[in-house]
């Protein structure tokens, strides 16, 4: 079933399940970029505070089950299968005709309920107002990350329209944290939405770089100014971290969360597929990044170009895209003279048959105007052959364009997530 935004099916499904979402406290996170990192910072910090915590993120990386984590582990096959069967049975019995994403989301809530989770960190799937995750009457906190143009067919063609949709997670008397470096028109819309919903207090989160690499200085209402060190790479992590730390500071008024819990949690955070450098046998280091829109490409380019200056290397880009992406715009940001592009596709996505991979030839044609780069298609090559070809062309290899492509790569290469 294709994407069908709306809450009626989801609310009916949850009602017939006994409303499992009412059994835990929810931290809701919406936005275009950075949601997953923010989720992970909060999740690992809550675990450091010995709070039984769940996390729900999407899309899945290797399999649908990995969208659901409980107390530091991906949901076990036993609990996932049990809860999935319960959800499917209820959906069939009451003919709610829920979408795949709604079924998976309900399964996550059912897993959290049966596991006795106290706090669940919930990433919005798309948008906010009509997303299947937006079923909490009174979450403990709402967070909005960086907002950019993406999914315009569903959310609107302007940043203001998209911001309004994402602000649909705001609830009366529930505090909200917003990435303070969003564009002014976005911040104005979010403030207006918060006022209309009577969501308050309204916090703008901002971080600044510290003395050392991957070190950030963040000021929060209760803890004041502190320094945090993260293993996650990229300048944009400063803002993701600022949102997470501000959120945790606010949560500390209701839960036993101390500053050292957060500092240790941040140090131990991992998030696969985002500036993720992995050592692959016989191929050496490969950088995997899920950048699939222009803003994410800009951040990836910043990181890659800093490495280019240091090592004076051209890059081999292994890319695949869903069939609605602006390949020309994204690759124009990434490519430099002497680079190589190998266009491929990703396999069918479990539970999401409407997600289609762009044909490699279409990708090639979209960037053929970049005459200073070589471009190949890899229709009939295995993943090993694709990566070997990329390595032969340039010692620096980057895989990007789609998390679904990264999922294929991680499965094939048996990389940990």
Curated annotation (Swiss-Prot):
Any one GO cellular component localisation term in the record: cytosol
Pathway: Cofactor biosynthesis; tetrahydrofolylpolyglutamate biosynthesis
UniProt entry tagged with the keyword tRNA processing: no
Assigned EC number: 6.3.2.12
Function description: Glutamate-adding enzyme which catalyzes the binding of the first glutamyl side chain to dihydropteroate. Leads to the de nove synthesis of tetrahydrofolate. de novo.
Sequence similarity: Belongs to the folylpolyglutamate synthase family.
Positions annotated to bind ATP: 34-37, 274, 289
UniProt-recorded name of the protein: Probable dihydrofolate synthetase
Enzyme class, spelled out: ligase
Any one GO molecular function term: ATP binding
Binding, Mg(2+) 1: 58, 123
Catalysed conversion reaction: 7,8-dihydropteroate + L-glutamate + ATP = 7,8-dihydrofolate + ADP + phosphate + H(+)
Binding residue positions for Mg(2+) 2: 151
SUPFAM superfamilies: MurD-like peptide ligases, catalytic domain, MurD-like peptide ligases, peptide-binding domain
InterPro entries attached to this UniProt entry: Folylpolyglutamate_synth (IPR001645), Mur-like_cat_sf (IPR036565), Mur_ligase_C_dom_sf (IPR036615), Mur_ligase_cen (IPR013221)
Gene, per the UniProt record: fol3
Domain of life: Eukaryota
């Amino acid at each position: 079933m294709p994407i069908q935004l709306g809450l009626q099916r989801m609310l009916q499904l949850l009602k017939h399940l006994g409303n499992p979402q009412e059994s835990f406290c929810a931290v809701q996170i919406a936005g275009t970029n950075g949601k997953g990192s923010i989720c992970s910072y909060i999740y690992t910090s809550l675990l450091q505070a010995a709070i039984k915590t769940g996390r729900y993120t999407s899309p899945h990386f290797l399999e649908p089950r990995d969208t659901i984590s409980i107390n530091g582990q991906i949901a076990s096959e036993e609990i996932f299968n049990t809860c999935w069967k319960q959800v499917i049975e209820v959906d069939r019995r009451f003919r709610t005709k829920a979408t795949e994403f709604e079924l998976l989301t309900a399964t996550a809530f059912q897993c959290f309920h049966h596991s006795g989770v106290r706090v669940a960190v919930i990433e919005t799937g798309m948008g906010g107002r009509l997303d299947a995750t937006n079923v909490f009457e009174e979450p403990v906190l709402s967070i909005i990350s960086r907002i950019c143009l993406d999914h315009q067919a569903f959310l609107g063609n302007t940043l203001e329209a998209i911001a309004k949709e994402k602000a649909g997670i705001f609830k009366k008397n529930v505090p909200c944290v917003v990435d303070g470096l969003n564009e002014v028109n976005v911040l104005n819309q979010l403030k207006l939405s918060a006022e209309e919903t009577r969501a308050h207090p309204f916090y703008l989160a901002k971080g600044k770089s510290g003395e050392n690499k991957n070190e950030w200085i963040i000021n929060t209402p209760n803890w004041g100014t502190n320094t945090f060190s993260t293993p996650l790479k990229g300048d944009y992590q400063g803002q993701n971290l600022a949102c997470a730390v501000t959120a945790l500071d606010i949560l500390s008024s209701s839960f036993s969360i101390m500053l050292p819990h957060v500092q240790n949690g941040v140090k131990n955070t991992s998030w696969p597929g985002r500036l993720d450098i992995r050592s692959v046998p016989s191929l050496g280091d490969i950088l995997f990044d899920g950048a699939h829109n222009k803003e994410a490409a800009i951040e990836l380019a910043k990181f890659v170009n800093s490495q280019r200056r240091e090592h004076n290397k051209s890059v081999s880009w292994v890319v695949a895209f869903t069939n609605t992406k602006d390949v020309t715009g994204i690759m124009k940001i990434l490519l430099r003279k002497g680079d190589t592009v190998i266009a491929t596709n990703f396999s069918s996505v479990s539970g999401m048959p409407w997600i289609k991979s762009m044909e490699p030839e279409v990708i090639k044609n979209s960037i053929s105007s970049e005459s200073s780069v070589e471009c190949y298609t890899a229709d009939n090559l295995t993943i090993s052959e694709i990566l070997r070809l990329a390595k032969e062309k340039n010692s620096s290899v980057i895989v990007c364009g789609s998390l679904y492509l990264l999922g294929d790569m991680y499965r094939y290469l048996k990389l940990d997530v």
